[in-house]
Amino acid sequence: MTYLLGIDGGGTRTTTCLSTGTGKILARAVVGPTNPLKVGFEATERELLRAAREVLRRARLAGVVPGLSPAGSGGAPKVTFESVCVGLAGVDRPQVHGRLFHWLRRAIPARHHWLTSDADIALRAAIGHSPGVIVISGTGSIAYGRDDRGRVLRAGGWGVPFDDCGSGYDLGRKAIIAALRDYDGRGPYTQLTQKVCRALKIPDITQVVLKRLTPKDVAALFPLVLDAARRRDAVALALCDEAGRNLAELAVTLLRRMGWLRRVIPVVYAGGVFRASLRIRRSVTRHLRRYAPQARILLLRHPPVEGALTLARELAES
């Protein structure tokens, strides 16, 4: 039997899926983050191996992935992958792609390997091979587009501390800034001050500078902004609108570069921030429609890992 492996890796978690060659899903698994620019190459490689092992274990199959032997799988039949497709944040840099692709071919044996960005597999899951744009806002943010000729463009996604506007990290960082400004009297009162202190278990907001917060820790604060906005906190409402404007700018930038501002074209919203906040989705749409009134707005309905499986199946059939 032919087996396909699809992996979707980001700054928060990694989802993997095993299917037959006909597309029947056999197992899914979730492990830790695999963005090499945020967690490093070694941690990324470790979690990718763990993802492959775990999905095989759940499918009660033994594979050729190191660390998973037939004996460790209850005597299950030993299988190899026909094709493996991995979509990761951060791999569109040539030096990153080259190193990880070389590792992937050695570590997870298969007849075919494909390494691409998480944005690519998400767009594939949303609209297949059709032209369009996807805006992703999770731990980080990026816009990715594909035109009629298959040409690929991107905007944003340059990472912490230089970019990722409108992301969970950006919202969490600005929540901390707003709380510090509130404490000083440089900015208005905001519920975020108390919420951030409670979330970080600190007696007052000045203690935040002593915390060794990772980008993931900061991104985990973004739901506080959404909660404060629901309670009509003026600062939180402004932060949500600013996030919407920043994310719309990513999409508009690609639509302009592709000459699509007046064309009916799908613009897909994806990632944890979009899933969590109707307010931010509406803000993005409002700002986007000022420049691209005919854009066809879609919320990603299929998990990006399904886009990875689609690519894996195409590789197997090529």
How should these model regions be labeled?
Residues 1-61, 75-82, 103-108, 125-133, ...:
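ATP-binding/phosphotransfer module of carbohydrate and carboxylate kinases, centering on a glycine-rich
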Residues 91-189:
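Phosphate-binding/catalytic loop of phosphoryl-transfer enzymes
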Residues 63-67, 71-74:
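Intrinsic, low-complexity polybasic segments
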Residues 86:
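Long C-terminal interaction/binding lobes of large macromolecular proteins
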Residues 58, 67-68, 94:
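Compositionally biased, intrinsically disordered low-complexity segments
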